[in-house]
Amino acid sequence: SGSTISGYSTAARHCRPGYLEQADGTAWVALYSQNMLEMAVELAAHQPAYEDLATNFAGQFLLIARAMNGIGPDGMCDEEDGFYYDVLRLPNGSATRLKVRSMVGLLPLCATTVVEKWQRERVPALTARTYERFRRMPELLESIHATGPGQFGVADRGILALVNESRLRRILSRMLDENEFLSPYGIRALSRYHAEHPYSFWAQGQEYRVNYLPAESDTGMFGGNSNWRGPIWMPVNALLIRALLQYYLYYGDNFKIECPTTSGNMMNLFEVAREIANRLTRIFLRDPTGRRPVFGGAEKFQSDPYWRDHLLFYEYFHGDNGAGIGASHQTGWTGLVAPLIEIFGHLDARTFLEGGREAAFQHG
């Protein structure tokens, strides 16, 4: 749930009446609208009636984006920090950003989808209506990444994205900072910044704190075996990699960023995606001493010849040393490491840029 990913213990429940606007939950719905739009465009090739449905989903995405990126002191996007936060709204009209640097602030990146030229041509009425809507309501276009005539990227690609270029750079500068989100083993669910700077929130006379906890949770929430305050979770890492690849199809080599932050090492977004995938893969590989980070201090699994080569797909992983934590049979989502190995094993940046998304699933 959104309140889990945000890293704090549903403190909003103790602030009744009042409600929480969740940046991650809103981003999920924006991504859902994009996915449904893509499917409707595919179906419209065979049944034109689906073009109206595609128009509906495009409109939903734009309205969600306007709500999420609204300018103001109480919106989800904090222009000063260059980051997204959940917002707690109270009956008196006041609002408080819950300034936890968590996965909540990264997930808006995931609502990103490139629009190929052939897709626009397949639904000309939708394309025309969208551009007309931008003309009549420029605030819609201003709330998302620039797109449309004069704003197409590589190979005339358009883009539907919640996060524009300037915000993208600011969010990535935190995400790729090894003192914040970037672990040797992937992207942490909570910034390491909170190890030295815990977030404190008061509700009805009680303090709620969010500390960086790279391993097990220190609360009984959700059974006590779920922790979004520092560990590495494979499914959200995979979604972030997907988003970076979408942005790369639009920008190509015209967008580069330091990875890691302050290293001086400039990468395009395909290279950044591959770097994160390599770090996730490192969880399961033997290090120079022959030990696999995934097995942590479990000596039986590390050294016993009958066990050491039989990998376990844990629920999540220690944010600093990569050790597996939680259920050890979470193959459904932790198994995503396998297609990441496959995709980056056969795909290079140029082939991907020229061939588009289909190239990721082609061999030879």
Each model region followed by its residue ranges:
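Acidic, mature catalytic/reactive cores of soluble proteins
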Residues: 1-364
